[in-house]
Design a protein with these regions (language model features):
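Structured segments of extracytoplasmic/periplasmic soluble domains
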Residues: 47, 51-60, 95-102, 183
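An N-terminal structural lobe/cap that precedes and organizes the functional/catalytic core
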Residues: 28-38, 63-66
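Active-site nucleophilic cysteine motif
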Residues: 38-53, 82-94, 197
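Papain-like cysteine protease catalytic cores
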Residues: 64-134
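Bacterial N-terminal signal peptides
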Residues: 2-11
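C-terminal motif of bacterial Sec signal peptides marking the signal peptidase cleavage site
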Residues: 13-15
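Bacterial signal peptide processing site
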Residues: 17-19
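Active-site signature of cysteine proteases
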Residues: 33, 121-254
Length: 254
């Protein structure tokens, strides 16, 4: 997933044929780290998946704020990295297991020298040790809803963004929406992706007409009308979702 064009942004974040409501009532708004700004980098998928991991930990009472620049720099070692640096949430999960991760304050820009160690609560970790403490191997499940593939088994997503050839557990879109809503209401972190963009789902809201929306934490800074948040209707979730990542616990697996 990469930088989304404004025209597509306008069509996605409004209901088809209707003016976007000006007022939303929040039903759930989960804890999150400060809104970041990806700038011109097409790495929304890194920001979105890290934001989901951060929200997951904040729900446990942990304070975790992770550096997207570390992954953006380390993935340059990947032989199959696309020139445009696009990817998916599942890609990020693979990369942090391989290269590790550091806190945001340890690497606040792409120009910062890559740290060899991560520090938390006065303790020193290798970057891989730190990554395993914030995202255990196989902790997350990658989901999709493709009605042209068999349900309840892993399938391929054939997109250039899926350059690590990750496989996704395929469920009906109604099931995916219900599982996502339940995860958010239980304060889990969730990463959402369509073909052009990725964001973290941090809450649920409804408009004055009673229509429900997922509250998204975007990665375009805080200058927008909602301070860096976006509102995606359930209708657009059904229409546009390519993939969702959440913990297996959030999905309901042991």
């Amino acid at each position: 997933m990469g930088v989304i064009l404004f025209a597509f942004h306008a069509s996605l974040f409004t209901s088809c044929g209707h003016k976007e409501p000006n007022h939303y009532t929040h039903e759930v708004l989960n804890r999150m780290t400060p809104i970041k700004d990806q700038g011109d980098s097409p790495t929304c998928w890194i920001y979105a998946m890290l934001a989901a991991i951060e929200t997951e930990h904040l729900a446990w009472g942990d304070s975790v704020n992770l550096s997207p620049y570390y992954i953006e720099k380390m993935m340059e070692r990947e032989p199959n990295l696309p020139e445009d640096k696009r990817g998916m949430g599942a890609t990020l999960l693979r990369l942090i297991q391989k290269y590790g991760i550091v806190g945001y304050n340890a690497m606040r820009s792409i120009e910062t020298p890559v740290p060899k160690y991560a520090f938390m609560a006065g303790a020193e970790y290798t970057t891989q040790e730190f990554a395993r403490s914030v995202c255990k191997p196989d902790e997350y499940i990658a989901l999709t809803a493709n009605d042209e593939e068999p349900y309840y088994q892993e399938v391929d997503i054939v997109l250039p963004d899926n350059w690590l050839n990750d496989r996704f557990y395929n469920v009906p879109i109604d099931t995916l929406l219900k599982k996502t809503e339940r995860a958010v209401r239980q304060h889990h972190g969730v990463c959402w992706e369509d073909e052009e963009h990725a964001m973290a789902i941090v809450g649920i809201a409804h408009d004055d007409g009673g229509h429900r929306y997922f509250i998204m934490k975007n990665s375009w800074g805080t200058d927008g009308p909602y301070g860096g948040l976006e509102y995606i209707s359930y209708k657009n979730f059904r229409r546009n979702t390519v993939a969702v990542e959440m913990t297996k616990e959030a999905y309901g697996l042991p």
